[in-house]
Amino acid sequence: MKNDITFYTRFQQDILAGTKTITIRDESEAHFMPGQRLRTGRYEDNGYFCTLEVLRVTPVTLAQLNEEHARQENMTLAELKKVIADIYPGINELYVIAFKKVEG
């Protein structure tokens, strides 16, 4: 079965532990809706590891990222900005997808 959303393996444990409660994505993944349940897998091998429920999707610019976003990502603000720049180079318009783990 196909996953609805994937995360790099390095984020799996934080998601399962509930310490990572948001993901920041570009416009191509901004279509998720609150209440939607997402089959969630690892980016590297597409292996399923849990089901997430979308709580909200909020637009944000790179400049608007703050300590609260970093806390919800379970990293420092400097780490968060570096990860975003590495994954989405040159992209300024992003979306915060807040979620909770419901299975897995």
Swiss-Prot record:
Cellular-component GO terms for this entry: cytosol
Pfam families noted in UniProt: ASCH
Annotated EC: 3.5.1.135
Keyword set, alphabetical order: Hydrolase
KW Hydrolase (keyword) present: yes
InterPro entries for the chain: AC4CH, ASCH_domain, PUA-like_sf
MF terms in GO: hydrolase activity, acting on carbon-nitrogen (but not peptide) bonds, in linear amidines; N4-acetylcytidine amidohydrolase activity
Active-site annotation: 20 (proton acceptor), 23 (nucleophile), 73 (proton donor)
Organism domain of life: Bacteria
Chain ranges of the ASCH domain: 6-102
Catalyzed reactions: N(4)-acetylcytidine + H2O = cytidine + acetate + H(+); N(4)-acetyl-2'-deoxycytidine + H2O = 2'-deoxycytidine + acetate + H(+); N(4)-acetylcytosine + H2O = cytosine + acetate + H(+)
EC top class named in words: hydrolase
Family to which this protein belongs: Belongs to the N(4)-acetylcytidine amidohydrolase family.
Protein task: Catalyzes the hydrolysis of N(4)-acetylcytidine (ac4C).
Entries under HAMAP family matching the protein: ac4C_amidohydr
Entry protein name: N(4)-acetylcytidine amidohydrolase
Organism from which the protein derives: Cronobacter sakazakii (strain ATCC BAA-894) (Enterobacter sakazakii)
Phylogenetic lineage: Bacteria, Pseudomonadati, Pseudomonadota, Gammaproteobacteria, Enterobacterales
